[in-house]
Design a protein with these regions (language model features):
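Conserved H-loop
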Residues: 24
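Catalytic core of pol beta-like nucleotidyltransferases
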Residues: 1-18, 27-32, 42-99
Length: 99
């Protein structure tokens, strides 16, 4: 988790992006084969077409280097807020650890 947290700090030191760990790793229920679920929330107005490559893909790459599966999902703040009544949103909110 240290490498993931360090990458988040490096990538987003001057930006308006938040990265959260959720799922089994956040709950402390992970097994060796568990993936790392990351929610990336960017400010509204971010060029979402290029945002995945800029904000999410580096986590996928570091996962390959570490031999881990990292699964990032990306939303803008308003997109994430629109998910408020979904089971996914509620599960993430229950588990989320800000990196």
């Amino acid at each position: 988790m240290t490498a993931i947290r360090d990458l988040a700090k490096e990538l987003f030191v001057d930006s308006k992006v938040s990265v959260y760990l959720y799922g089994s790793r956040a709950r402390g229920e992970a097994v060796n084969s568990s993936d790392w679920d990351l929610l990336i929330v960017a400010e509204d107005g971010v060029d979402i077409e290029n945002a995945f490559e800029k904000y999410a893909y580096p986590f996928t790459e570091i996962g390959w280097k570490l031999g881990e599966q990292i699964t990032p999902v990306l939303y803008t703040k308003s997109e994430w807020a629109a998910e408020e009544h979904t089971a996914f949103y509620m599960n993430v909110q229950n588990d989320a650890i800000l990196l």
